[in-house]
Amino acid sequence: TVIRKSYDDNITSSDVNARDFFDDRFYLNPTTSHDSLRVMRLENKVFIRLQPWKSDGIISKLDVGLGDKLLNYFAFEPDSYISGGSNKVFNSVYLYAGAQGQYDKYLQWNAKGQYTFLGHEINDFGIEANVSFSAYPFRRHRTSPLTLNAHFETTLKEPDYYQQHMLTNHYRWDNDFGKISTTRLEASVSV
């Protein structure tokens, strides 16, 4: 996947509205902007899927695999004045696993996890789990379930390159953030 974004403008020194829009921040050129960002992501996976029992069993599928993620970022940097624009390339290798199953029409579940053991995003991980319980309490509509859904997710991830570094005509930062931890628990009921 390749994502490109280009931005051009010409703002005169007397254009008060346009200058106020950017809080009068012009880091590279006071009247003209031409900013370009590009991200390329290439991901390869090798996995094996096991179906230990029947397809609608309590454990119906097990997945185990190995993945390789290549990220290529292009952005302007102060060194670009001397050497021209350059790409920043990061590679990471990870293990992932998942499982899913169900019990009749009353229970469905799935879970997956990923751990990066080599490369730029070393020690990143993510765990995600979903469960759905269904009951059929309605006498007149015996096939209409009352369903409780729950979702749990936790991640620890390296910030991406643009969260850490940015130099455009109107925005500039150079940070050294640590890993970002996110935990989410959601539940819903449907009738």
Language model: regions and residue ranges:
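Exposed, low-structure sequence patches enriched in small/polar residues
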Residues: T1-V16, D24-R25, N29-V191
